[in-house]
Amino acid sequence: MYRGLLSLIIVFILTSLALAKNEDKILQALIYEEHGQFQKACNIYTNLFHENNESIYLQKALLLALSSDLKQKKELLKASKDFLEHTAIARLNALYFFEIGDYKQAEAILYKLIKEEQDYRNYEILGDIFAKKALYTKALEQYNIAYKLFEHESLLLKIVEINIKNKNIDQAKKALEDFSKKSGCTFKTCTLLLKIYQEQKNNKASIQILKQLYKLHNDIKYIYAIIELLVQDKDYTQALDLTQKYNIDSDTKIFLYTQTKNYQKAYEIALKRYELSKEKKYLSMAGILEFEIYMNPKSKKITDPKRLASIIKKFEKSVDVRSDALYQNYYGYTLIEYDIDIAKGIELVNWALEQEPKNLYYLDSLAWGYYKLKDCKKAYEILQKTFHDKEFSNSDESKEHLKAIKKCLKK
């Protein structure tokens, strides 16, 4: 139901000297309205109407009675029949008929009102009736007329909703864009616009809307959403700039630094985070990042025994059966590859496979472990499970392992 503006009454009070004697009662009614005590407010307006027979009191009482379904609704509707020459009261009657589903009577009142006045509400209610009847083209026509008379958000959203129903996405988008340019970003309009941009894979426009939503609500989730889109676009530098400007978590920073291959910075954050929180996963991250920093670019291996010992120590302190599969596999593969403890390495990789049974990298690690144990037949059987993925099978490491295992089988 539609609720009138309080300013209507305030203006009425200030301009009507004849009603000065009722100011206290009207102010009390306004206070009741402000606090949501609509029955008490309606009682005052109803009494004022009975005492003065003034249409403005009937209008206010009827509006409250209809919008809050109050006890004197029928009484006031009956009384309003003698005041239908007042457009506001006639419109309330149209609303009542609309609410009870008597569209014929509602339309008759509205068409009469449209002849008498160009008030956007007449067209909007008529549009609502057509929308209820699923006559969306007619509804849109009325909403557009109403919107030309008064551009407000609730009307815009009705126009957008029908355009989306009719698959006119570009028209819906344009209406939202035009409104946001004129009136600024609101939560509803910008959220709808964001949804359209995201469905159209328009990351650049989505980021601009997310920035506006962040200014509107100061909610960090919008910054995270921007970072996610920048990652999709592989714009890691700009994403990192946001992590410096806002309070972004360490995991996101570590991820972004690894994407830019700044492993040293990622390593420093991971180690610092471990020292502060004692969360084992950060020590595991530090182990992986230390490997990336110091491995030989050509052989992809650690050649310094002291550095390898430092990495292994980090894994020993942080990786167990409850760890993420990624860390279990990385630690296990390191033990296998460097012939440190092949049996333990296989156990760790099996833990990882319990979590992710179809992970190609983990299967490759397990196959390599059995190759190191000279069980080449089993190694080949396991490696065969990765052959369906051509991209993985064509990787240098996979081809190297397959070549070694096949050579072993011929012995």
Residue ranges and their predicted role:
Residues 30, 63-64, 95, 128, ...:
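Residue-level recognition of tetratricopeptide repeat
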Residues 34-35, 64-68, 99-100, 132-133, ...:
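Register position in tetratricopeptide repeats
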Residues 23, 56-57, 88, 121-122, ...:
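Start-of-helix register in tetratricopeptide repeats
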Residues 288-306, 316, 320-356, 361, ...:
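Alpha-helical adaptor scaffolds
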Residues 52-53, 84-85, 117-118, 150-151, ...:
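Short coil turns that delineate tetratricopeptide repeat
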Residues 17-92, 406-411:
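N-terminal leader/linker segments that initiate helical-solenoid repeat arrays
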Residues 59-61, 91-92, 125, 158-159, ...:
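Canonical tetratricopeptide repeat
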